[in-house]
């Protein structure tokens, strides 16, 4: 119909991850884009590039792009970012990886970050601040550019700059802390209290320094004529003000009992399912989510099983349970702890 009305107009479609690449409607528009959240809602961030390689290898004549990708970040911080923690550090890591995977594949016709700014979303209750989607590279009030904003600036802007990440993460407990710097200049030198700790070159525009963390330190990054400054301070233990504590959460990840060498709710789905006992436990759990396993009402059915299992592999089980809760398939705290106790009896598979 579109081509009948205007032969010069190209058509496109945005496709969600669960849609099989062999679905017939993929071939209807002139160009195609997928909404992929590998690394946030499912899977691992490393899955993105290979997925597009697979699509392009099978359909080299179909222009493929990314219509949505992103992850959420608020003013939470950590030195050990993980998927689903809502920290500025994980968002920065996620976008570093997405930039390296997407911007180096010339066959991808377009990429669309979701989103430039945090925005209102009345029904959402994530990350500790209700009513907003926090996938923006800039805060809702437009006053603070998150570190991930500067990752894109390093790749896309011709304006010379250097940026030290983690400015809102001052108090750190580790003896050696990692300091990340973004710049579109070829070389960055980092100074700690006026003393150089080294120079680095990076064609990827991301620079990582290991910094001794003692007392109070002034960090200065120099790239050509550009300078940026930040501060860190050594503390005895992790400051809980940096950690998200979900309001009304049935169970938080740090409340879960872990046994060395055994599984827990904090392990990834893909790791748990390496064990036959773990796989049986997980499939039994999912079989009761929404309807009988394989039925159209089930969380996983015959139509989406392969794609859903691929997506969920990067989830910790506690994160999956929270997403199921958001879809009105919640478990009580007692049920979660009982499930964790069962996992604590299953040895990890090498």
Model-derived segments and spans:
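Compact, charge-rich alpha-helical regulatory domains located at protein termini
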Residues: 253-336, 340-347
